[in-house]
Every structure is written in structure tokens, then in C-alpha cells.
Curated annotation (Swiss-Prot):
Top-rank taxon: Bacteria
Keywords: ATP synthesis, Cell inner membrane, Cell membrane, CF(1), Hydrogen ion transport, Ion transport, Membrane, Transport
GO cellular component, one term: proton-transporting ATP synthase complex
Cystine crosslinks: none
Compartment(s) of residence: Cell inner membrane
HAMAP family: ATP_synth_delta_bact (MF_01416)
UniProt subunit comment: F-type ATPases have 2 components, F(1) - the catalytic core - and F(0) - the membrane proton channel. F(1) has five subunits: alpha(3), beta(3), gamma(1), delta(1), epsilon(1). F(0) has three main subunits: a(1), b(2) and c(10-14). The alpha and beta chains form an alternating ring which encloses part of the gamma chain. F(1) is attached to F(0) by a central stalk formed by the gamma and epsilon chains, while a peripheral stalk is formed by the delta and b chains.
Gene3D superfamilies per the UniProt record, alphabetical: N-terminal domain of the delta subunit of the F1F0-ATP synthase (1.10.520.20)
Annotated family: Belongs to the ATPase delta chain family.
Protein function: F(1)F(0) ATP synthase produces ATP from ADP in the presence of a proton or sodium gradient. F-type ATPases consist of two structural domains, F(1) containing the extramembraneous catalytic core and F(0) containing the membrane proton channel, linked together by a central stalk and a peripheral stalk. During catalysis, ATP synthesis in the catalytic domain of F(1) is coupled via a rotary mechanism of the central stalk subunits to proton translocation. This protein is part of the stalk that links CF(0) to CF(1). It either transmits conformational changes from CF(0) to CF(1) or is implicated in proton conduction.
Membrane topology, record value: Peripheral membrane protein
Protein name: ATP synthase subunit delta
GO molecular function: proton-transporting ATP synthase activity, rotational mechanism
Gene it is expressed from: atpH
Length: 188
């Protein structure tokens, strides 16, 4: 089993590790994961919020005040997550909060034996194929379960593209044809 230190790195990884350790200590990892998902959704939905967390114009005090009001309205006030986000704001690190959330999710997924996969296919998969693919990916990842999102993209013509964590396998017909085309150009 990989150590937490090797799963994430950098400044965002250090903050995520600290939050994950605190959440474990408080028995609140699921609650923190849910709260972070809520905050991440808020970031995704609001361009103003994204601009706010990235802007160097606001002081740490202004960011903390605004964040308190926002978290209060979202029902996250007084939680481990709100304490963490306020600390991040006070340290002027809100610009990296999306990376911190991503890294926390990596640590959380690893702790609960979950791997995430993104699959692209040319045509919709049957339920039995989805189940078989999940089982195969779980075996490859060495995890107890796999959460898989399937995207249908007819432009790949056939085959499959799988991204599992940081690994990607492109076994699409489109890629194979492009590879053959490139080799033919080299020869002729």
C-alpha cells in the first residue's frame, strides 16, 4: 500500500495531508470529503468565486471575512472544513484550494479503497460490459472498488480509452489509424 506522502506532493499536497490527518483524528473524513465536494461545486458554478480565490488583490482578512459569510450561507460554518478553508485564506493560499481539494480526495479515495476511472468509448456499453470493466480495473488498480464515468465519443471510431488515476491507455481505433498514417508518411 502506498504511503500518503507518495500519493500527493507540493504545497497543495502538504495542506491536503494535514487536513486529512486532522479529519482522521476527529473521525470526520467523510464529512470533510462531503464539505469539500460542496465547496468544489461552488467553485465550479461561480466564476466570481473562482476569481475571488485566485485574486491577489484581496487581503487575507478580506478573504477570510468573505469566506466566512459564504461558508455560513452554505451551511458549512463551524466545521473542520471551514476551519481549514479559513486557515488557507489567512495564509493567502486560497489560489491553490482546488488542488488541495483534489489532493484530499486522492488521500480519501486511497484510504477507503476507491479508484476513479474515466472511460471513453465509441458506443454505449452494456451493463454487463460496464461491470466486467469495473472488475478488471479494480484488479489492475489493486483497489476494492472502482468508480467509473463512461463518456460516449463516436469520433474515436472504436475501441476504448481508459484513464485510471495517472495512467492512461488509448486503445481507440482513431489513435491506431493516426499512428498508421504517421508511419506511412515516414516511409513515403
Amino acid at each position: 500500500m502506498a504511503k500518503q506522502e507518495t500519493l500527493v506532493s507540493g504545497m497543495a499536497g502538504r495542506y491536503a495531508q494535514a487536513l486529512f490527518a486532522l479529519a482522521q483524528e476527529r473521525g470526520a473524513t467523510e464529512g470533510v470529503a462531503t464539505d469539500l465536494a460542496t465547496f468544489a461545486a461552488m467553485l465550479d458554478e461561480s466564476e466570481d468565486l473562482r476569481n475571488f480565490v485566485r485574486s491577489p488583490v484581496f487581503s487575507a482578512e478580506q478573504q477570510t471575512k468573505a469566506l466566512d459569510a459564504l461558508l455560513d450561507r452554505a451551511g458549512l460554518s463551524g466545521t473542520t472544513t471551514s476551519q481549514f478553508l479559513n486557515l488557507v485564506a489567512s495564509k493567502r493560499r486560497l489560489f491553490a484550494v482546488a488542488d488541495m481539494i483534489r489532493d484530499f480526495n486522492i488521500l480519501h479515495d486511497h484510504a477507503v479503497g476507491l479508484s476513479r476511472a474515466a472511460v471513453t468509448v465509441a458506443e454505449p456499453l452494456k451493463d454487463e460490459h460496464v461491470a466486467a470493466l469495473k472488475d478488471a480495473l479494480a484488479a489492475v488498480a489493486g483497489s476494492q472498488r472502482v468508480e467509473m464515468s463512461v463518456k460516449v465519443d463516436p469520433s474515436i471510431i472504436g475501441g476504448i480509452i481508459v484513464q485510471l488515476g495517472s495512467r492512461m491507455v488509448d486503445n481507440s481505433l482513431k489513435t491506431k489509424l493516426n499512428s498508421i498514417r504517421a508511419r506511412m508518411k515516414e516511409v513515403g
